[in-house]
């Protein structure tokens, strides 16, 4: 694990319920048919003075958040995914750790992929300086990704190298399309299912996270390059940007807890 240095500018405080309301409105939590229980998943202290942010909710992450003195852990992947789950075994240990630390757990899954300002896909598009942005990446009738144009055309390997510099991880490249990259679609995490949509929009390349075997041939048959930059590594952007936005709004310091999975 690596822990980013705590931000030092914020010295604020906000009530838990006020922050939860603000997050719900800012992220449009109720706008998506997402079964993953977006919002406050575990209730803790009623005053928020420090935030930790992380991609996943593992026991290690919860322990690190508690040790950091955080009052709220902000995550992309929470503890609940649309089905009843007994509080036993590892799940019990996670819940117990949060409750014993009086730690709030707030999860934002699809709303944080899709958000136009601090979302994973919006932040990646900004980091790549994409222009002429368009909604992209259909998910149950909602566009949660983004498509855009590079400032200048790049070779496929040059573009993959640029992604590697951005994420710090070696990319897997399926070169099924043009060797020259100009129009790019971005869908973080498990977004390989957008290959056909990318082809229909005239995109030459899809940037996503996690490789899936069933989509290997689609890259070549639809004529679209696919760059897999890692599920984890493509989803660090949103929680960091959201935590920074909270600091800007309320003066609450934060730090990022980095537990990369290599996937």
Swiss-Prot record:
SUPFAM superfamilies to which the protein is assigned, alphabetical: NIF3 (NGG1p interacting factor 3)-like (SSF102705)
Alphabetically, the GO molecular function entries are: metal ion binding
Which residues are noted in the entry as a divalent metal cation 2-binding?
A: 77, 231, 235
Keyword tags: Metal-binding
Report the superkingdom from the record: Bacteria
One CC-aspect GO term = cytoplasm
Which residues are listed for a divalent metal cation 1 binding in this entry?
76, 113, 235
Subunit description: Homohexamer.
Into which family does the record put it? Belongs to the GTP cyclohydrolase I type 2/NIF3 family.
| PANTHER family, A to Z | GTP CYCLOHYDROLASE 1 TYPE 2 HOMOLOG, NGG1 INTERACTING FACTOR 3
This protein is called: GTP cyclohydrolase 1 type 2 homolog
Source organism: Deinococcus radiodurans (strain ATCC 13939 / DSM 20539 / JCM 16871 / CCUG 27074 / LMG 4051 / NBRC 15346 / NCIMB 9279 / VKM B-1422 / R1)
Classification of source organism: Bacteria, Thermotogati, Deinococcota, Deinococci, Deinococcales
């Amino acid at each position: 694990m690596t822990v980013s240095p705590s931000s030092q500018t914020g010295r604020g405080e906000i009530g838990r319920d006020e922050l939860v309301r603000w997050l719900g409105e800012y992220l449009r939590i109720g706008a998506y048919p997402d079964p993953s229980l977006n919002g406050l998943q575990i209730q803790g202290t009623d005053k928020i003075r420090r935030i930790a942010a992380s991609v996943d909710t593992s026991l290690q992450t919860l322990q690190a958040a508690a040790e950091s003195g955080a009052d709220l852990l902000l995550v992309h992947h929470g503890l609940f995914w649309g089905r009843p789950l007994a509080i036993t075994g590892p799940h019990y240990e996670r819940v117990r750790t949060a409750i014993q630390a009086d730690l709030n757990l707030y999860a934002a899954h699809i709303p944080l992929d899709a958000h136009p300002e601090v979302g994973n896909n919006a932040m990646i598009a900004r980091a790549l300086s994409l222009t002429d942005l368009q909604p992209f990446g259909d998910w149950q009738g909602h566009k949660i990704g983004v498509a855009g144009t590079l400032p200048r055309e790049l070779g496929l390997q040059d573009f993959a190298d640029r992604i590697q510099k951005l994420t710090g991880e070696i990319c897997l490249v399926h070169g099924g399309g043009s060797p020259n990259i100009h129009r790019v679609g971005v869908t973080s995490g498990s977004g390989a299912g957008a290959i056909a949509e990318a082809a229909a929009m005239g995109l030459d390349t899809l940037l996503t996270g996690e490789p899936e075997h069933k989509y290997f041939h689609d890259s070549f048959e639809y004529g679209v390059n696919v760059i897999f930059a890692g599920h984890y590594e493509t989803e660090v952007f949103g929680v960091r940007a959201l935590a920074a936005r909270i600091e800007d709004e309320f003066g609450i310091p934060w730090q990022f807890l980095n537990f990369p999975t290599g996937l």
